[in-house]
Amino acid sequence: MKEILNALYHQKDLNDEEVKKLFTLIIHEKVSPVQLGTILCALKIKGESFKEISVAATTLLEHAPKPFDSGLDLIDNCGTGGDGLKTINVSTIAALIASSMGLSMAKHGSRSVSSHSGSADLLENLGVNIEMNPTQLENCFKQTHFGFLFAPLYHQSFKKSAPLRKELFTKTIFNCLGPLINPLRPKIQLLGVYDRSLCKTMALALKALGVKRAMVVNGGGTDEIVLHDITHACELKNSEILEYDLSAKDFDLPPYDLKELQIENAQESVQACLDILGNKGKDSHTMVVVANVASLLYLSHKAKDLKEGVSMTLEHLKTKAPYTHLQKIIRLSHA
């Protein structure tokens, strides 16, 4: 531990062996709160490298139980959170719609820290059992193409370190790790980050972890694809990383103001979700979700480009099938 701390004090990147040792100690609660706080802050000040992030994620995954083996290339759109803008839960609504269109969505998430409604909060408020056992989870996934993996059930180190991390009043490597440690190891990811500077780093980490296809995005300061501003993207395709910007025009959608996405409380998030799934949501809410679903369709090779993905999603919403699909997920999650 002394060597690890000294390396960080001198702002040196940790090697693979040091990262693996550090996170193994964290998992087994062999790091004191003072040491952990110091390490997290030192990593933050130095700037976490993609190698440090990917090796830490690999170590955490090695200690996480895998609930079942689907045999499919699963998809996740878990983001880092932490943008603090208190918008509707775009990624969770997008995952529900995408799964109703046949995409195999394995959604990894937890409760909110900086918003009114994290993925776990929204799903729980909708009536979904967020703590499904492996049998329930597999059954729900097989019948609906949707499974929610509540992060604290699989990663105790996250749960136990949460109070300390909250007291640091800053984002840490744990924010970056959340989207990378889905126990079902998805091969396709749409990953939103709270800071544009993380896009390339996280794309490299996904590549190192063996993800086949991904897009890491930051849109106007949010960890989503947005229509109110430019979305910066790093796309992992054929083992290469392509870096570019997206605007509403790339989706053939009109722009909307960020304020139209912001909500006052968790109940507003629930109502926005139900309205969108039932094809009666506000245009500003629906269209940003549609842009994110379109990106999932594109990454999954179900749409040739983003504009086709938008058309497919809008047509699907007209059927109101996503609303019926949610009711099935709720029922099966409790079965």
From Swiss-Prot:
Pathway note: Amino-acid biosynthesis; L-tryptophan biosynthesis; L-tryptophan from chorismate: step 2/5
Quaternary structure, from the entry: Homodimer.
What is the protein's known function? Catalyzes the transfer of the phosphoribosyl group of 5-phosphorylribose-1-pyrophosphate (PRPP) to anthranilate to yield N-(5'-phosphoribosyl)-anthranilate (PRA).
Which amino acid positions bind 5-phospho-alpha-D-ribose 1-diphosphate, per UniProt?
Answer: 79, 82-83, 87, 89-92, 107-115, 119
The protein's Enzyme Commission number: 2.4.2.18
- A Gene Ontology BP annotation from the UniProt entry: L-tryptophan biosynthetic process
Residue positions annotated to bind anthranilate 2 are 165
Do you know which InterPro entries this protein is assigned to?
Anthranilate_Pribosyl_Tfrase, Glycosyl_Trfase_fam3, Glycosyl_Trfase_fam3_N_dom, Glycosyl_Trfase_fam3_N_dom_sf, Nuc_phospho_transferase
Could you say which cofactors this protein requires? Mg(2+)
Give the source's domain of life in one word.
Bacteria
Identify the keywords attached in UniProt to this record, alphabetized. Amino-acid biosynthesis, Aromatic amino acid biosynthesis, Glycosyltransferase, Magnesium, Metal-binding, Transferase, Tryptophan biosynthesis
Protein residues bound to anthranilate 1: 79
**Chain positions recorded as Mg(2+) 2 binding sites:** 223-224
Q: How is the cofactor bound?
A: Binds 2 magnesium ions per monomer.
Protein family per UniProt: Belongs to the anthranilate phosphoribosyltransferase family.
**What are the annotated GO cellular component locations?**
cytosol
What is this protein's name? Anthranilate phosphoribosyltransferase
Q: State the encoding gene.
A: trpD
Q: Which reaction does it catalyse?
A: N-(5-phospho-beta-D-ribosyl)anthranilate + diphosphate = 5-phospho-alpha-D-ribose 1-diphosphate + anthranilate
GO MF entries: anthranilate phosphoribosyltransferase activity; magnesium ion binding
